[in-house]
Design a protein with these regions (language model features):
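Acidic, low-complexity Ser/Thr/Gly/Pro-rich repeat segments typical of extracellular/periplasmic
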Residues: 2-21, 25-243, 398-405, 410
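Exported/periplasmic cell-wall-interacting domains
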Residues: 155, 244, 281, 290, ...
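Solvent-exposed, polar/charged alpha-helical surfaces in well-ordered, non-transmembrane soluble domains
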Residues: 157, 161, 165, 205, ...
């Protein structure tokens, strides 16, 4: 109904966490402390071990990881304790290059890391390093993610991370390495930087219904450029709905069709955006839901009204919603009279609101106006090759070439 510039509700509040590129089984720090047996080639290589950080290093970020370089074997265990002897839990990255603490380290505190490596003949070698973290910085950068612990989302739900300051290009890889996603069952996925402040993760295809998602945005204390450091870590465990709900909206005919698990369950007449405020065509997801809200366009050029609205479901940052519009019932199915929103009747809006989830896929077609990239969660509005090209880290071939599809219909 209107192109609002502000969010109508707390949009799936900034909470939670996220993933590295190879997150199909759980990227980054989701493995156990013990790695598998050494390769046969290690039989002929003398066992050696180098650990990081450098001994007696000071002023390190609280996002510091314990690095290990092993020849002739593999890492067997990592132990990290502070000056009081309190142990810090953590886990090895899948590639074994470093050990990631489960939480940010404390500021201005001394730590000792002990790494044990094992060789092909089960011989062991141990190395330790002691380091001190930096003092608490005065320049904290706000961060957040649109996933909440304990919530259930639709099959198209991306994991969207926001950083409230531009991240320089040379630091985006280090940011992405601190974003972790694990899906159960495992599904290949990747990250895409939509802007210097926003990076989002999606699987190659829609999430399997019933998937469990475990996410961590480990940006607490991470250097983000210009003297700023991430404010905190965020974690969440969420579920994907067991039913796959999909909305398909067309301009000709002016209809909204609801599909549940691929079966058409309801068809509704709609009125879309009028000629000077057309609705966007593209692949979107429901971003937020509000049973009762107020659209206030005062201060927006060409608009000047305040209207209470029921059963509103946000599709774009620019202010396109699906919502009840009893004032346009006579036009629904016949004429486009809205300010860009999808107008439906009160009964249809209530029925739909009760059955949808944040993250359900929505396709709008035939309006003549293309959805702008980044105007909402537009992860599904590009093909897979384009999406993975937006990663700041190399994407494994198994993920890059994963079976993917463009949701119905192609534009």
């Amino acid at each position: 109904m209107t192109r609002l510039r502000k969010v109508i509700a707390t949009l799936a509040a900034l909470t939670a966490a996220v993933a590295t590129t190879a997150a199909c089984t759980g990227s980054g720090g989701d493995t156990n402390d013990t790695i598998g047996a050494p390769t046969p080639a290690a039989d002929r290589t003398p066992l050696s071990l180098t650990v990081r950080p450098k001994a007696h290093a000071t002023g390190l970020p609280v996002s510091t990881e314990i690095g290990a370089t092993v020849a002739g074997g593999s890492v067997d265990s990592v132990r990290l304790v502070d000056a009081h002897g309190d142990r810090v839990d953590g886990s090895l990255r899948a590639d074994g290059t470093s050990w990631v603490p489960d939480r940010p380290l404390a500021y201005h505190r001394r730590y000792t890391a002990t790494v044990v490596a094992v060789g092909a003949r089960r011989q062991h070698i141990e190395r330790s390093t002691t380091f001190t973290t930096m003092s608490e910085p005065g320049n904290r950068v706000g961060t957040g993610m649109y996933v909440q612990d304990g919530r259930t989302y639709g099959v198209g739900m991306p994991i969207a991370v926001e950083i409230l300051r531009d991240v320089p290009k040379n630091l985006r890889a280090s940011v992405q390495r601190r974003l972790f996603v694990r899906s159960d069952p495992p599904q290949p996925g990747a990250w895409h930087w939509f802007s210097p402040q926003r990076v989002e993760y999606r699987p190659a295809t829609w999430w399997q219904p019933g998937t469990k998602l475990t996410v961590r945005m480990a940006l607490g204390g991470l250097p983000l450029g210009h003297g700023g450091y991430g404010d905190t870590d965020r974690t969440a465990t969420a579920r994907i709905a067991t039913d796959r709900v999909e909305l398909r909206i067309t301009n000709r005919p002016k209809q909204l069709k609801v599909y549940q698990n691929g079966k058409l369950t309801r068809t509704m007449p709609v009125s879309l955006g009028k000629a000077d405020a057309p609705s966007s065509s593209g692949h979107m997801v429901i971003m937020d839901k509000a049973a009762h809200t107020v659209f206030d366009t005062r201060g927006i050029p060409g608009e000047n009204y305040v209207a209470p609205v029921d059963n509103a479901q946000r599709l774009t940052w620019g202010g396109e919603f699906i919502h009840a519009a009893p004032w346009s019932v006579a036009d629904q199915g016949h004429r486009n009279v809205s300010h860009g929103c999808v107008n439906i009747s009160d009964p249809d809006a209530a029925w739909l609101f009760a059955r949808t989830h944040i993250g359900d896929p929505v396709t709008v077609s035939g309006t003549g106006t293309r959805l702008a990239t980044g105007n909402g969660w537009t992860d599904w509005d590009m093909d897979w090759a384009t999406f993975v090209a937006g990663s700041a880290l190399p994407v494994p071939d198994s993920v890059r070439h994963a079976k993917a599809y463009q949701p119905y219909p192609k534009r």
